């Protein structure tokens, strides 16, 4: 098929690779424009942009698709279908209607649960035991279109957003190839009206760890916000991110470090901190981290935070 690919971050790259490997003709690749990044704040192409150029594909990165000129350029590609995965721009109706089979979206949740920008983070943070991928026929609403294909997967008890992100990306890549191969035979199932939830964009302000809640909630926040933006707490004015954790046994005053394994008492239960990161430093496993930073048994993280 003649395909327009629309995606931007790392999550989208395996999908592009799968479409190329399956022999589809990529008419053009649409992605977000290069943005300033790094210490020098130089414009850096997005992961999809870089991969598309490496594959010798035409790359387009308009700031918007609302203008008639951009819409005409899109329609002129004469595509059979557009495949959209984490593109990041709203698609006007003229764009949705341009390909012969419309626009298919790969969404990382079991719709209608977790419509919106951060379905992987929100599923882990909410304690969901299962999630999945939906291939959806796009329409004007936010992730409201009928579902052509869905597949469910279990969320591991210690799985982070980073790990689940990678698994779902590969799952989506396999599923879109299957969907395009059987597109005329797929039945579009309208999403049920019951069970709708929204995965709002992650706000950095919600990443601070509250040790007074249950250990399960602390652990889910740590795993759900790893690697970005990273759940954090402060000690003596230094912000420390926690990128991996697991539930542990132990009781004590809320926020107290209970042992040399960085087990911290919560409102109920305790969590063991497995991987941490200081500002401006690389992430480190707990044992390596503790060689350069002291968090002794008996330290109360609430008191240490207030002491700054």
Swiss-Prot record:
<dbReference type="InterPro" id="IPR036477">
    <property type="entry name" value="Formyl_transf_N_sf"/>
</dbReference>
<dbReference type="InterPro" id="IPR005794">
    <property type="entry name" value="Fmt"/>
</dbReference>
<protein>
    <recommendedName>
        <fullName>Methionyl-tRNA formyltransferase</fullName>
        <ecNumber>2.1.2.9</ecNumber>
    </recommendedName>
</protein>
<keyword id="KW-0808">Transferase</keyword>
<dbReference type="InterPro" id="IPR001555">
    <property type="entry name" value="GART_AS"/>
</dbReference>
<keyword id="KW-0648">Protein biosynthesis</keyword>
<dbReference type="InterPro" id="IPR002376">
    <property type="entry name" value="Formyl_transf_N"/>
</dbReference>
<dbReference type="Pfam" id="PF00551">
    <property type="entry name" value="Formyl_trans_N"/>
</dbReference>
<comment type="function">
    <text>Attaches a formyl group to the free amino group of methionyl-tRNA(fMet). The formyl group appears to play a dual role in the initiator identity of N-formylmethionyl-tRNA by promoting its recognition by IF2 and preventing the misappropriation of this tRNA by the elongation apparatus.</text>
</comment>
<dbReference type="InterPro" id="IPR044135">
    <property type="entry name" value="Met-tRNA-FMT_C"/>
</dbReference>
<feature type="binding site">
    <location>
        <begin position="109"/>
        <end position="112"/>
    </location>
    <ligand>
        <name>(6S)-5,6,7,8-tetrahydrofolate</name>
    </ligand>
</feature>
<dbReference type="InterPro" id="IPR041711">
    <property type="entry name" value="Met-tRNA-FMT_N"/>
</dbReference>
<dbReference type="InterPro" id="IPR005793">
    <property type="entry name" value="Formyl_trans_C"/>
</dbReference>
<dbReference type="GO" id="GO:0004479">
    <property type="term" value="F:methionyl-tRNA formyltransferase activity"/>
</dbReference>
<dbReference type="Pfam" id="PF02911">
    <property type="entry name" value="Formyl_trans_C"/>
</dbReference>
<dbReference type="GO" id="GO:0005829">
    <property type="term" value="C:cytosol"/>
</dbReference>
<comment type="similarity">
    <text>Belongs to the Fmt family.</text>
</comment>
<dbReference type="InterPro" id="IPR011034">
    <property type="entry name" value="Formyl_transferase-like_C_sf"/>
</dbReference>
């Amino acid at each position: 098929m003649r395909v327009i690919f629309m995606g931007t971050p790392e999550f989208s790259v395996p999908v592009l690779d799968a479409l190329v490997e399956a022999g589809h003709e990529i008419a053009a690749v649409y992605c977000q424009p290069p943005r300033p990044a790094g210490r020098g704040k130089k414009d850096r192409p997005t992961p999809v942009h870089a991969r598309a150029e490496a594959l010798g594909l035409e790359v387009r990165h308009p700031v918007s698709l609302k203008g008639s000129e951009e819409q005409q350029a899109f329609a002129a590609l004469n595509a059979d279908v557009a495949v959209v995965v984490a593109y990041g721009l709203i698609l006007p109706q003229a764009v949705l209607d341009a390909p012969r089979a419309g626009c298919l979206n790969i969404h990382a949740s079991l719709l209608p649960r977790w419509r919106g920008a951060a379905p992987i983070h929100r599923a882990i943070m909410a304690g969901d035991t299962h999630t999945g991928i939906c291939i959806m026929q796009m329409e004007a609403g936010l992730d409201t279109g009928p579902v052509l294909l869905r597949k469910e997967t279990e969320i591991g008890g210690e799985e982070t957003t980073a790990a689940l992100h990678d698994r779902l990306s590969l799952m989506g890549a396999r599923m879109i190839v299957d969907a395009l191969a059987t597109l005329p035979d797929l039945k579009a199932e309208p999403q049920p009206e019951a069970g709708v939830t929204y995965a709002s964009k992650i706000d950095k302000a919600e990443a601070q760890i509250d040790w007074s809640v249950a250990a399960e909630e602390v652990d889910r926040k740590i795993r759900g916000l790893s690697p970005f933006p990273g759940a954090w707490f402060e000690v003596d004015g230094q912000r420390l991110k926690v990128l991996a954790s697991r539930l542990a046994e132990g009781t004590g005053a809320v926020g107290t470090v209970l042992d040399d394994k960085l087990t911290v008492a919560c409102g109920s239960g305790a969590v063991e901190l497995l991987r941490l990161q200081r500002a401006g430093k690389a992430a480190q496993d707990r044992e390596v981290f503790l060689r350069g930073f002291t968090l002794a048994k008996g330290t109360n993280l609430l008191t240490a935070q207030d002491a700054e």
